[in-house]
Amino acid sequence: MSCKKSARTREKLLTAAGDVFVQKGFRDATVAEICARAGANIAAVNYYFGGKEALYQEAWRHCLAESLRAHPPDGGADPAAPPEERLRERLRALMGRIADPETKDFFISQMEIANPTGLLEEVMMRELIPMREKTLAMVRELLGPDADERQVVFCEACIISMCVHPLIMRRLGQKTPNARMPVIVDDLDAFADHVVRFALAGIHASRTPARAS
């Protein structure tokens, strides 16, 4: 098999695996279905990856790389821009990733949290922690030198939750239109602007000592 053909087959397997894992999760996905979708011999998974478990890990990493290519985590912000602008673009990029119907890694991660296999724990930590550290650094910068680490983590958790939960509900509503779920986000740009304003206002409020009642 030529190197080019081998690389194409591997790429097709990763793409097919991402589709199957995001639809069915790890346990219900089968090697046979993945190979059939990829147009590959059923022995191809063992040949290229050594088994379903390693394919799961590599497929998630491949899906993440694809979504980050489409939605760079920094949102294209100038590294020298003020922290407010850098945080704004970072949050808009995150929300764009989650809202994008082509994004698979995020929803594979959600399925892994709901039904853990333990197979993605190491690779997720290796890939996601550096991105989280950059967000924490921006929040830390915005809170100022007097902020303690607990305050930084609390603010970051609230901000990311505002980005994630409504867009998960939006995706669920799109997938199950007959469920008549309440519309939370009907305008992604307007929602992103709102989240950024709310986040920056919350950070500003956290910097201001609470008045004694």
Where are the model-predicted features located?
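Amphipathic alpha-helical packing segments from all-alpha helical-bundle domains
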Residues: 68, 85, 117-143, 190-193, ...
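Hydrophobic alpha-helical bundle segments that form small-molecule/ligand-binding pockets
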Residues: 80, 129-153, 176-179, 203-211
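Amphipathic alpha-helical segments used for helix-helix packing
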Residues: 100-122, 170-176
